Swiss-Prot record:
GO terms for cellular component: acetyl-CoA carboxylase complex. GO terms for biological process: fatty acid biosynthetic process. The keyword Cell cycle does not apply. Residues 75-86 have a biased composition (Low complexity). GO terms for molecular function: acetyl-CoA carboxylase activity. Residues 64-74 have a biased composition (Basic and acidic residues). Pathway: Lipid metabolism; fatty acid biosynthesis. The modification N6-biotinyllysine is found at K129. Homodimer. Gene3D superfamilies: 2.40.50.100. This is Biotin carboxyl carrier protein of acetyl-CoA carboxylase. NCBIfam families: BCCP (TIGR00531). It comes from Chlamydia pneumoniae (Chlamydophila pneumoniae). The lineage of its organism: Bacteria, Pseudomonadati, Chlamydiota, Chlamydiia, Chlamydiales. Residues 87-163 form the Biotinyl-binding domain.
Amino acid sequence: MDLKQIEKLMIAMGRNGMKRFAIKREGLELELERDTREGNRQEPVFYDSRLFSGFSQERPIPTDPKKDTIKETTTENSETSTTTSSGDFISSPLVGTFYGSPAPDSPSFVKPGDIVSEDTIVCIVEAMKVMNEVKAGMSGRVLEVLITNGDPVQFGSKLFRIAKDAS
């Protein structure tokens, strides 16, 4: 199963309102799960695209397996390839280009060590010339920024690692 087929499955899940999908086939086990909490729906925000003219948009998609969000298990040898980092993750709600600041010469929305609430804007994901603000969706402390400014992101790509509040 390749990435295009998985993306098609994710799109079909969204269209049909599915929250979870699992398949076992030909030695492959795949599980997909959508975060459907009310606070995670993002409204598009429009920015003047001239603010982002300093960002490069011709960078390759990163293929670091530590940043993948899909859990794959081969049934033949029962090895699992998934991240085991502690903390929770803020993931991209859509496919687009990641921007960690409102403009190329502006400071980042958040940096490691910052405290965020559910409504804190942590980044922008640009899709089809629309700048979409991404909110944290949880309270906690930013442990790590996993994406670089201008990097393309896929739906579900991990953007930030967060230590959630105990409350």
